[in-house]
């Protein structure tokens, strides 16, 4: 190409990276028309080949030339040589926003192209001096430099000088052959520049605030600024500390003046100011100060200390790791650092520290909108925050005893961790490379528009994926994506290559987190690579303790045992244990979880293929860890039936079995064990245990809901009792030597069993009824029924097997414990017609058919139960008072010794009994007229009461919430502890409360939160019960609830007495005798 005749061909333009060839030719023609020499045009074309967006760089360059010629500026002075031209074009290709600024601010062109003052080489002190001089302050004043210019002039000068230096930094970054290699330098320069800007803004604030000379003011940088790893465009996290400069300043004046200074410096940095044409620098975020944005803007040092001693949450100490004095009084800044460092380096010993920080990180991930999850360079999985989190956790855990780790910058800290033997050299190098790559991507995305962003370019339908699943990529579409193409050129990559590198980096960061934090917790024989480091005993103990293990020495022994040897189980454990330790650490009791994991391996590791299954199914392994570390009952159950682990890999296998499927199993047992009561009883009880296990696993895994688990357990009880009754009938037919049964027998479910609300530790409340067959006499039928019931009870709860009993509770039968276990239909008819009391009518609201003779059950329910439980006449005042008195006596007498009233989930104030008795009372009052109320379940009836406007929506919500929470808490308590006798009692210790809370959707170690929430719900429920059940006014109900809560800890508990449904029949019997 001749320099005198510059006429680029299409191929020349394409080689330079230009896409709109017609527009490019027109722009070059315009330059020639503006008397730009052909030689300079040729140099421009060559420079465009190095620009990230050549088309935009050319367009902006032409606009700048036109603007300079219009203002009669000497172009050769601003762009004196080819190097300056290349620097300028490279900046224009990486930042459209800077290019548009340059049209009107030639000093930015000069700063980017030649940087005559070499500002890109400034150290921290030189940048500070430059910006202080710009506002007319003395840079030699170390503590209180004061601006001499008025607000508008000073703010304009500060912002202009800041942007001149920013343009030089962008140019230094953009022309680098390897931008990742200089990324730490760029971030440090940006941080130094921000420090200087804040010093200048504080000098302006001193000038503008009366009395500022009496206030020592320091600015503490947090986050990226504090760690000297600032972005181009980012919120700047700050904390302000003030102290009096002389003894005469009172505290109120100090805070008032300090607040004005802080407000003014923020205004200078982030707000529009009258008379200032320069745009603001960046937003200041004070959310990391004590009490966040609700706290005071400025505080004295002692106030900060008091907050961190008494109120700060775990994540706030993690945030303090990056704190650094960035401007203001240096002595006060050092005093702040001296005060906070002990808090930082002892934070890992705080309760649940690492767990809370992990949950905070997880919460941030979960809050990312779904379409952006795989575009988030900073906050997404495998993003910058994952690298920072890994490094910070290692620092905080081991920095307590190793002072060499006490640094704030991510890459410096990673290097120190490698030198200290906490991270292998290879891991440190890989993580450093990944971090720099992602930071450069983030920087390039921000520079383009000089706006805050950390999103990877939008790839349309290919924006989703890259970690667990592949992206749906069309290479042609990627090549047409201008934003992606521009970012890819910054790394010298094709668009599809950048997408692959981004996804590879994210996957590696996630993998490195496991390898760096958890794999060194395995012994040296379990390391997978030669470069892996081995922790000292003390460091290993610190790391186990940090993730929640109460006995780190035992945990180390378990891990050593699990990974020792050359067997298949040991090999698989060496692969999956890092992830297992992480997941166990997320549970309430990691020690229990790891012990159960070891028991499984010892019991089944050599014979079962479950470990291979877990290696291949991440979701199943994670679910298993959640279960083992949160459920003693299920941990023990899995150690008896390891095949259940396979259910965790498929939600379909975890679904509750249908009644038909249960009947198939019970039918098979009937055929197989028809002549052996011991084997049949064992099979039925084992079936119950197995189904509790299935439903418990499903409930813990979130596959089925609370209500579905209750219905599923009810189906299990129905199927087992029906099969057991069938076995007993067949056996007694053979024993009696008859061909057909002398009597039909039915099981009427009562109580929560009747309401289809069976929990994992429930008894089965029932009434047993028989009716003689047409050709049988009463005596034979009665004898037959008694023998059948005897067999039935032996199967379910007799000493015939070591499997846990299924308690068949018959205390709700006529005459209670004093009545016969099984009663004839005629006797039931006579009893209920003549002697039934109000409480028995209420109990019949739950009656339903469960097993046996369906026609007999139907006759009982329709002819005997319905007229009593669905009366057509109103309850009398005497009947109403009888129900209320009975409930009051039950509350007073049935509560176990030593249990406070508000802590019993069933009988306590606002517990299950309050909800159920309230609903049942309203059923007795209205079900005679409203057929929809003729249901057995509590929540079903409550829904109808609300729909029929018999109860307000607000009251229904309170009752429903209390019943649901208390029911789930009972189930959770049983699975957590494995103790049925404690399932109704809310524990006092926070640790056990945390174990129960997990089942209600809380994270681990949230026992206090759960207790507060549950007791608040129960108090509100009790208030509703006081009004709707006891008939008190709102004021009386609130007063009674408050009095109960305040007196609960002082009120002595009475000795346990018999259940009221046992006492009540006894009273009835005495009344009948008196009548006779």
Swiss-Prot record:
<dbReference type="InterPro" id="IPR023057">
    <property type="entry name" value="GlnE"/>
</dbReference>
<dbReference type="GO" id="GO:0005829">
    <property type="term" value="C:cytosol"/>
</dbReference>
<dbReference type="GO" id="GO:0000820">
    <property type="term" value="P:regulation of glutamine family amino acid metabolic process"/>
</dbReference>
<dbReference type="GO" id="GO:0005524">
    <property type="term" value="F:ATP binding"/>
</dbReference>
<dbReference type="GO" id="GO:0047388">
    <property type="term" value="F:[glutamine synthetase]-adenylyl-L-tyrosine phosphorylase activity"/>
</dbReference>
<comment type="function">
    <text>Involved in the regulation of glutamine synthetase GlnA, a key enzyme in the process to assimilate ammonia. When cellular nitrogen levels are high, the C-terminal adenylyl transferase (AT) inactivates GlnA by covalent transfer of an adenylyl group from ATP to specific tyrosine residue of GlnA, thus reducing its activity. Conversely, when nitrogen levels are low, the N-terminal adenylyl removase (AR) activates GlnA by removing the adenylyl group by phosphorolysis, increasing its activity.</text>
</comment>
<dbReference type="GO" id="GO:0000287">
    <property type="term" value="F:magnesium ion binding"/>
</dbReference>
<keyword id="KW-0548">Nucleotidyltransferase</keyword>
<feature type="region of interest" description="Adenylyl removase">
    <location>
        <begin position="1"/>
        <end position="521"/>
    </location>
</feature>
<keyword id="KW-0067">ATP-binding</keyword>
<dbReference type="InterPro" id="IPR013546">
    <property type="entry name" value="PII_UdlTrfase/GS_AdlTrfase"/>
</dbReference>
<keyword id="KW-0511">Multifunctional enzyme</keyword>
<keyword id="KW-0460">Magnesium</keyword>
<feature type="region of interest" description="Adenylyl transferase">
    <location>
        <begin position="524"/>
        <end position="1076"/>
    </location>
</feature>
<feature type="compositionally biased region" description="Low complexity">
    <location>
        <begin position="1042"/>
        <end position="1056"/>
    </location>
</feature>
<feature type="region of interest" description="Disordered">
    <location>
        <begin position="1042"/>
        <end position="1076"/>
    </location>
</feature>
<keyword id="KW-0808">Transferase</keyword>
<dbReference type="GO" id="GO:0008882">
    <property type="term" value="F:[glutamate-ammonia-ligase] adenylyltransferase activity"/>
</dbReference>
<dbReference type="InterPro" id="IPR043519">
    <property type="entry name" value="NT_sf"/>
</dbReference>
<keyword id="KW-0547">Nucleotide-binding</keyword>
<dbReference type="InterPro" id="IPR005190">
    <property type="entry name" value="GlnE_rpt_dom"/>
</dbReference>
<protein>
    <recommendedName>
        <fullName>Bifunctional glutamine synthetase adenylyltransferase/adenylyl-removing enzyme</fullName>
        <ecNumber>2.7.7.89</ecNumber>
        <ecNumber>2.7.7.42</ecNumber>
    </recommendedName>
</protein>
<comment type="similarity">
    <text>Belongs to the GlnE family.</text>
</comment>
<dbReference type="Pfam" id="PF08335">
    <property type="entry name" value="GlnD_UR_UTase"/>
</dbReference>
<dbReference type="Pfam" id="PF03710">
    <property type="entry name" value="GlnE"/>
</dbReference>
